[in-house]
Amino acid sequence: MSTLIEVHHLSRQFGDHCAVDDVSFSLDKGEVLGFLGPNGAGKSTTMRMICGNLTPTIGEIKINGYDIIEQPKLAKAELGFLPEIPPLYPDLTVDEFLTYCAKLHGIRKTAIKKSVLRGKSKCGLADMGTRLIANLSKGYQQRVGIAQAILHNPSVIILDEPTVGLDPIQILEIRELIRELGNEHSVILSTHILPEVQHSCSRVQIIHHGKLVLNESIEGLSRRMTSSSLKVRFCEQPELALFQDIAQVTAIEELDKQQYRIHHEQGFSIAQTVAKLAVNNDWGILELMPEKHDMEQIFLSITQGSSNHE
């Protein structure tokens, strides 16, 4: 699998403030990378450096083998970019705007029409060519913004908060479009909306205070989200020492006299063992519920944990 983006030891200082601190990662062909972080974490600064709009204080960025500093034109030709606010001209039709963008991308005059048709087709705009951009819904305006980013068939597409301000149906449509783009391009999705990453990406990175604090596949993240604790309530107070004898149990947390949270190793289910203990000892079970971590809990634990160590 070919690597399309290589970022090595990237840092950016603004005076005494370090906005991005020693960030390294890569993006392979066909990957959709979710780039997550709270406001002020360094997401936008990192994206600006990758796009060549901001020079790093130190570090190296290569786009499909081209150094963004040493070979900026060749590197930028491999990129398609949709900023958070799409750079649209509302008084132009979709065809007029995309034709103009094709010229800016340096597409040959004889290939412009074909490129515009391909961009419209990929983004669900085939019947929208004569419509004024000002008269399009926010969802279709986002599609036009994505279309301009892929006209020149770039290796990498960078999307900055592409679903902000959209209604639920439009969000679902843009998510599906992002997944489809991932089949032919590599995509970086910069967002602070956690479900976007779960639904659209194959890998996730979290940046916090300028540092990468997580780089994980969605499969790996899903494993983190599987249950590693059991919430249980008994009719009678149990003998806790019996739970400690269960090999996979790591800790027992008392919530009240009859309710407990039993922590265990990931990948194991202890519910049946706990239920059998309760029956054999006549404790009676009022509640037995595996607790699953959602992505928001994981995000908060990672970012808050990294804050506590600083």
Where are the regions a protein language model picked out?
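ABC transporter nucleotide-binding domains
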Residues: S2-V7, R12-H208, L214
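Residues at or immediately flanking beta-strands
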Residues: E60, L132, S229, G284-E287
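Surface-exposed charge patches
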Residues: Y100, R118, A241, K276, ...
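A short linear hydrophobic-aromatic micro-motif
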Residues: G124, Q248-E253, G284-M289
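ABC transporter nucleotide-binding domain
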Residues: E173-E265
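C-terminal coupling/interaction segments
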Residues: Q266-E310
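Non-catalytic surface loops within mature trypsin-like serine protease
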Residues: K29, D127, E236, H264-Q266, ...
